[in-house]
C-alpha cells in the first residue's frame, strides 16, 4: 500500500486519540497528560516535515491506532466516539473553506505557541485556556456543531470545558492533516482493507 495510506491512518489516529480524551474528560474530569501534550504539540507543529513529526513519533499515536484497530474489527467499546469523529471530519470541510476563520485560527495558534514556549509546556492550563477560547470563538460556530456529552458536574467547570475545546481544536487539526494526506470519507467504504493493513503496520 502507498505511503499516503500509512500517513492517513496516523492522522486519523490523531483525531481518534484527541476525541478519546474529550470523552474521558467529559465523563471523569481527568485526562492523560502525555496524550493531551501530544495533541497540543500537533496543533503547534504546522510546518512539520511528516505526519510522524507532527505528533513527535508514530509511537505517540499508539492509543489512537489501537482505537482504529478495534473500530475496524467491530471491537470498539465507545459507541459515541465514531460519531464524534465523523462530526469532526465533516466540520473540517467547512473550516478549510472559511478562509476568514482559518486566518483567525492560524493567528490564535501563533499566539498560543508563543505562550506555550514562555511557559515551557504546550499543555499548560493557560495554553489550554487560550486554545479552548480560540475554538469557542471560531470553529465552534461552524456546522456541524460537535456536541460533547458527559457528567454535568465536570462540564460545568471552566477548566474542563477549556481542555475539551482545546482537544477538539487538535482533532480538527488532525482532520485537516488527514485530508491533506488524501483522506476521504469514501475511504471507509472503498479502502477499508487498505486502512486496516496500514493500521496493523503502524502498530507493529
Swiss-Prot record:
Membrane topology qualifier: Peripheral membrane protein
Primary localization class, coarse: cytoplasm
Compartment list: Cytoplasm; Cell inner membrane
Keyword annotations of the record: Cell inner membrane, Cell membrane, Cytoplasm, Membrane
A Pfam family that the UniProt record links to this protein: DUF489
Keyword Flavoprotein attributed: no
Superkingdom, natural source: Bacteria
InterPro entries assigned to the protein according to its UniProt record, in alphabetical order: HflD (IPR007451), HflD-like_sf (IPR035932)
Signal peptide: none
Keyword Transmembrane helix: no
GO cellular component: cytoplasm; plasma membrane
Similarity comment text for this entry: Belongs to the HflD family.
Name of the protein: High frequency lysogenization protein HflD homolog
The species this protein was found in: Xanthomonas euvesicatoria pv. vesicatoria (strain 85-10) (Xanthomonas campestris pv. vesicatoria)
Gene name of this polypeptide: hflD
Amino acid at each position: 500500500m502507498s505511503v499516503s495510506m500509512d500517513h492517513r491512518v496516523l492522522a486519523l489516529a490523531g483525531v481518534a486519540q484527541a476525541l478519546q480524551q474529550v470523552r474521558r474528560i467529559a465523563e471523569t474530569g481527568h485526562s492523560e497528560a502525555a496524550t493531551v501534550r501530544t495533541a497540543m504539540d500537533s496543533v503547534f507543529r504546522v510546518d512539520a516535515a511528516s505526519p510522524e513529526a507532527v505528533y513527535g513519533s508514530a509511537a505517540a499515536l499508539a492509543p489512537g491506532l489501537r482505537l482504529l484497530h478495534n473500530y475496524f474489527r467491530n471491537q470498539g467499546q465507545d459507541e459515541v466516539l465514531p460519531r464524534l469523529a465523523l462530526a469532526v471530519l465533516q466540520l473540517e470541510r467547512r473550516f478549510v473553506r472559511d478562509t476568514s476563520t482559518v486566518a483567525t485560527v492560524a493567528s490564535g495558534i501563533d499566539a498560543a505557541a508563543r505562550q506555550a514556549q514562555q511557559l515551557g509546556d504546550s499543555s499548560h492550563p493557560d495554553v489550554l485556556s487560550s486554545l479552548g477560547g480560540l475554538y469557542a470563538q471560531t470553529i465552534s460556530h461552524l456546522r456541524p456543531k460537535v456536541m460533547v456529552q458527559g457528567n454535568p458536574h465536570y462540564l460545568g467547570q471552566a477548566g474542563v470545558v477549556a481542555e475539551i475545546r482545546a482537544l477538539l481544536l487538535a482533532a480538527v487539526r488532525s482532520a485537516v492533516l488527514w485530508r491533506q494526506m488524501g483522506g476521504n470519507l469514501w475511504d471507509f467504504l472503498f479502502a477499508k482493507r487498505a486502512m486496516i493493513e496500514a493500521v496493523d503496520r503502524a502498530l507493529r
